[in-house]
Regions:
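Short, well-ordered alpha-helix to beta-strand connector turns
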Residues: 5-6, 81
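Short, flexible hinge/linker loops that cap or flank conserved catalytic cores
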Residues: 1-2
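Conserved Rossmann-fold cofactor-binding substructure of NAD(P)-dependent oxidoreductases
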Residues: 48, 56-83
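Redox-cofactor binding/interface segments in oxidoreductases and associated redox assembly factors
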Residues: 86
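N-terminal Rossmann NAD(P)H-binding glycine-rich loop of SDR-like oxidoreductase domains
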Residues: 6-28
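Conserved glycine-rich Rossmann-like NAD(P)H-binding loop of the short-chain dehydrogenase/reductase
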Residues: 29-45
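Conserved Rossmann-like nucleotide-binding pocket used by diverse enzymes
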Residues: 9, 34, 64
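Active-site catalytic pocket residues across diverse enzymes, especially alpha/beta-hydrolases
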Residues: 25, 29, 50, 54
Length: 86
C-alpha cells in the first residue's frame, strides 16, 4: 500500500503508541503526519527531537493542540486528512 501524497492524523500523538505510529509512518512516502494532542510541552519536545535526529523527515510532521472531546479542535485538525490513528 502506498501513502504517497496522503495525510495521517495521530490522536494522542505524543504518547508512546502515537510516537511508535509516527516513527513507523516516517519510513513511508506519506506526505504529512499530524500529531494531535493536548500537551504543548510534549509537542515542542517531540518537534525538537525529530529536528535533531531526522531533519529530512521533520518537515512532514505538523503539530495540532487539541482534545478529542472538543469537536472544534478535531474538525480543525481533520481538514484534508486521509487516515486517522486513534
Amino acid at each position: 500500500m502506498t501513502f504517497q501524497g496522503k495525510t495521517l492524523l495521530i490522536t494522542g500523538g505524543t504518547g508512546s503508541f502515537g510516537n511508535a505510529v509516527l516513527n513507523r509512518f516516517l519510513a513511508t512516502d506519506i506526505a504529512e503526519i499530524r500529531v494531535f494532542s493536548r500537551d504543548e510541552k510534549k509537542q515542542d519536545d517531540m518537534r525538537h527531537e525529530f529536528q535533531a535526529k531526522l531533519p529530512e523527515a521533520a518537515g512532514k510532521i505538523k503539530f495540532y493542540i487539541g482534545d478529542v472531546r472538543d469537536l472544534a479542535s478535531v474538525k480543525s485538525a481533520m481538514v484534508g486528512v486521509d487516515y486517522v490513528f486513534h
